């Protein structure tokens, strides 16, 4: 019995038709693990940064028709929410588990906060080859950093700084069949390794 990780069949919750039925599937197959990950990693971030972090599991409460295509737990230093702050995420689409750190378009003082990525441009480029960027958290697309030109990356960061709807995340994503999802130990090790790479961008 696993506590934190996800099986390939859990991702099939996103194939369930209809809002109520899909929410029921998410509640059964995915949300229990997200709550456990929320407890584990809010403690992890608190111990790593010296700031108190709170977990926020997606509720999808505003939806009335369209079922969610993704779900997540986010970590930020506010009990009230995470969207206004730089934050960490563990989440899922039907074809991927993703891990991210960055800034949404709704963030307070977004232009100033996003400049951390401008200052640490070289550090982004030096992340391992399987690290990615996400420029729209609502879409599954996450190009590999190694596949972007300097100009592509600079433009993406500038968009987050200057455009109202712009956002920027550094990310990592694996498939539902990935061996790092086979056990809690392997999954937690993967997540901790990823967040260790992200933390210097938070504290910069």
UniProtKB/Swiss-Prot annotation:
Signal peptide: none annotated. InterPro entries: UPF0637, UPF0637_domain_sf. Transmembrane segments: none annotated. Belongs to the UPF0637 family. This is UPF0637 protein SaurJH9_1166.
